[in-house]
């Protein structure tokens, strides 16, 4: 059996990962029910990250 991964929009908000790049991306925040900017470190993290606010909202805001 494959482990079940949470849907992208239910994954942790703003997971920047262990690296030290400075990349502005957007992540869906379940607490505020909004897509918000965060800084991504460039590696690992999770799938709750989008290049644009519009892309995040299209995927996560119903």
From Swiss-Prot:
What PROSITE patterns is this protein classified in? BPTI_KUNITZ_1, BPTI_KUNITZ_2
GO molecular-function term, one example from the UniProt record: serine-type endopeptidase inhibitor activity
Q: Organism's domain of life?
A: Eukaryota
Q: Which UniProt keywords apply?
A: Disulfide bond, Protease inhibitor, Serine protease inhibitor
Q: Give the positions of the site Pseudo reactive bond for trypsin.
A: 44-45
BPTI/Kunitz inhibitor domain mapped to chain residues: 9-60
Pinpoint the site Reactive bond. Answer: 20-21
**Mind telling me which Pfam families this protein's record contains?**
Kunitz_BPTI
**Paired cysteines (S-S):** 9-60, 19-43, 35-56
One GO CC annotation: extracellular space
Functional summary from the UniProt entry: Inhibits chymotrypsin and thus avoids the accidental chymotrypsin-mediated activation of prophenoloxidase. This enzyme is required by the insect immune system to produce melanin which is used to engulf foreign objects. Also inhibits trypsin weakly, this may be due to the presence of a pseudo-reactive bond in positions 44-45 (Lys-Gly).
Q: What is this protein called?
A: Chymotrypsin inhibitor SCI-II
